[in-house]
Amino acid sequence: MLTERQLIILQVIIDDFIETAHPIGSRALSKSEYLPYSAATIRNEMADLEDLGFLEKTHTSSGRIPSEKGYRYYVDHLIGPMNQHEAGILRKYTDGEFFEFEQVVQMTAEVLSELTNYTSIILGPEMFEATLKQIQVLTLSDHTAVAILVTSTGHVEHRSFALPEGIASSDLEKLVNILNDRLKGVPIIRLGEVISTEVAQLMHRYMDDFEASFDLLRAFFMNEHPVKLYFGGKSNILMQPEFNDVDKIRSFYALIEQEDEIANLLKNTHQGIKVSIGNENKVEAIKDLSLITASYHVGDNLMGTIALLGPTRMEYKKVISLMKGISDEMTNTLDRWYKGDS
């Protein structure tokens, strides 16, 4: 457990390094208005913080910089709420009038990158505005079948699935008829909701093996929506001193171009804010970066992920509060827009 003095010194060191990207020593810190301690006292505390793993030396300076452990402690214990200026910017943005889902998401990506000077990525469902036009099910064998979904946008999707043990062909036929009757014209994002209510009631009434059929339906329709990526500030990373290295730049842009890998990186994000610092990231290309993610919703549907990529000396105070605010505002805006209240 850190002492109050160590906490203050650690916070000042991290704040300074985030702003300057330069190591700092005890003499410079002793001149800070936030540290009423002598250079000798600060030097001793910095040595203890280094022994504890919160600070580390560089090869080119006698000063210290935060370690990943230091950043992690900073994120977990020293972050405050969003300031009024940032909250005002978000409200101004969300007060705008939007006519398309893509407009909302792309604007969010651009605003987030502009406010932070980092690279923003938003994972969104591809078929948010599409409705179901038709569904067909073709049995391939006693154990497998393929469903063909056609949407109002002309998108055709084939999904193979395993048939429940012993399901009758008559039940499968009834199921397809019920789905086409009740789901035609329903937005893709609302399929799970309608299936859980209207469709479930009809299945219970008319089908012999309700449980097996409903389990099949739940596994089939209530999975993740197809995804699309929206970027903001792809070149912002070039403004960071850490990216003077050509190999780092090449590696980063190679990752950005691999949208499937980015989608896989973001799509399993849990609800709320998550901060991954440096080596906490599993993808090699971002092990020198920090990744902050937040989820957004429409109603009860988890629709996607908002993400920011930046250096490990990221402005965590600002970014985390912004991510929380923009996640909430985006959820509210999309909810109002989707329900036709705005």
Swiss-Prot record:
This is Heat-inducible transcription repressor HrcA. Belongs to the HrcA family. The keyword Transcription regulation applies. GO terms for biological process: negative regulation of DNA-templated transcription. InterPro entries: GAF-like_dom_sf (IPR029016), HrcA (IPR002571), HrcA_C (IPR021153), WH-like_DNA-bd_sf (IPR036388), WH_DNA-bd_sf (IPR036390), WHTH_transcript_rep_HrcA_IDD (IPR023120). Keywords: Repressor, Stress response, Transcription, Transcription regulation. One of its GO terms (molecular function) is DNA binding. Negative regulator of class I heat shock genes (grpE-dnaK-dnaJ and groELS operons). Prevents heat-shock induction of these operons. The keyword Repressor applies. Pfam families: HrcA. Coiled coil: none annotated. Gene3D superfamilies: 3.30.450.40, Heat-inducible transcription repressor hrca homolog, domain 3, Winged helix-like DNA-binding domain superfamily/Winged helix DNA-binding domain.
